[in-house]
Amino acid sequence: MSVVILGTGSCLPEKIVTNKDLEKIVETNDEWIRTRTGICERRIAGPGEQAYILASRAAKNALDAAGLVAEDLDMIVVGTISAHMVMPSCACMIQQEIGAKKAFAFDVNAACSGFLYAMEVGSKYVATNPAMKVLCIGTETLSARTNQQDRNTSIIFADGAGAAVIGYEEGDRGILASKLFSDGSFGDILFLSGSESTNTDLRLGEYEGSHIHMEGREVFKHAVRAMEGAVNTIMEEVGVSPHEIKLLIPHQANIRIIKNLGERLGLSSEQVFVNIANYGNTSAASVPIALDEAVRGGKIESGDLVLLCSFGGGFTWGASLIRW
């Protein structure tokens, strides 16, 4: 018996923002964005599309795929850094929205690695209690936390949600190995500050917004190296080689990062899933959205070896190897 993914789902906002649209807002152009990021367009949340709403829709799709209903869930764990409220948690709001009355729910903060962290936490619960059904989600509305005048971030970050339901099953398929890592010494390279609560000049009730800060070149260097190390560690532990991998689904951070990672791992372009052109970088939602798209697009079949990997602020990173 092993922990398996029973169903996946995703949800994207309706509004599409193209590179041409961004040319009207910030000093940039379509060619510059495409060549440096691989992004052509992205989805931006509008009214009524908060992180928990997008997540709830993704959750319902995942439950449908798993043949389950919300009342079957025992636990909800959500990776997010852009919930529109600090309290209650995004997970609790999702629990109420979908009607998962018996599930306990909480958030994890691991930035772009949030979904992998959520999956690891959820899988440990399932491993110790095989009857459990756990909903793991990555959801973000980072457009609201991005300085639209900063072309280093405004062209990259976008909104969306992805989900997976996990449980226990007999057989050989399932999560074969997972590894998570963190290094807080790089916290000043990629961060999203809070409400500036340390500013004593603010009077009660006042709020200063915060935006994502990213040193792109440093992030690139560390991201490729970290994800490569995590993936190699898992492949060595399980005893598989690159040619046995059907599909690598990496965090959709930047096309250069994705291509560089694939090359360093010795994978062909056909083995690396890419959808950043359509959705941009959706942080914690990136991997589950890509996973759901790959599943529904028929790119993954029963018995295939699938690798998930991600890297985010903290730094946080990790990888997971799954036999589908």
UniProtKB/Swiss-Prot annotation:
Pfam families from the UniProt entry: ACP_syn_III, ACP_syn_III_C
Keyword annotations: Acyltransferase, Cytoplasm, Fatty acid biosynthesis, Fatty acid metabolism, Lipid biosynthesis, Lipid metabolism, Multifunctional enzyme, Transferase
Region (ACP-binding): 252-256
Pathway: Lipid metabolism; fatty acid biosynthesis
Complex formation: Homodimer.
HAMAP family on file: FabH
UniProt xrefs under InterPro entries: ACP_syn_III_C (IPR013747), ACP_syn_III_N (IPR013751), FabH (IPR004655), Thiolase-like (IPR016039)
Record-annotated active site: 112, 251, 281
PANTHER family: 3-OXOACYL-[ACYL-CARRIER-PROTEIN] SYNTHASE, BETA-KETOACYL-[ACYL-CARRIER-PROTEIN] SYNTHASE III, CHLOROPLASTIC
Entry's family note: Belongs to the thiolase-like superfamily. FabH family.
Main subcellular location: cytoplasm
Keyword Zinc-finger included in the entry's annotation: no
Listed name of the protein: Beta-ketoacyl-[acyl-carrier-protein] synthase III
Gene from which this protein is expressed: fabH
Role according to the record: Catalyzes the condensation reaction of fatty acid synthesis by the addition to an acyl acceptor of two carbons from malonyl-ACP. Catalyzes the first condensation reaction which initiates fatty acid synthesis and may therefore play a role in governing the total rate of fatty acid production. Possesses both acetoacetyl-ACP synthase and acetyl transacylase activities. Its substrate specificity determines the biosynthesis of branched-chain and/or straight-chain of fatty acids.
Listed GO biological process terms: fatty acid biosynthetic process
UniProt-recorded Gene Ontology molecular function terms: 3-oxoacyl-[acyl-carrier-protein] synthase activity; beta-ketoacyl-acyl-carrier-protein synthase III activity
EC numbers on record: 2.3.1.180
Domain notes: The last Arg residue of the ACP-binding site is essential for the weak association between ACP/AcpP and FabH.
The protein's enzyme class: transferase
Highest taxon listed in the record's lineage: Bacteria
Keyword Membrane: no
Location of the protein in the cell: Cytoplasm
An annotated GO cellular component: cytoplasm
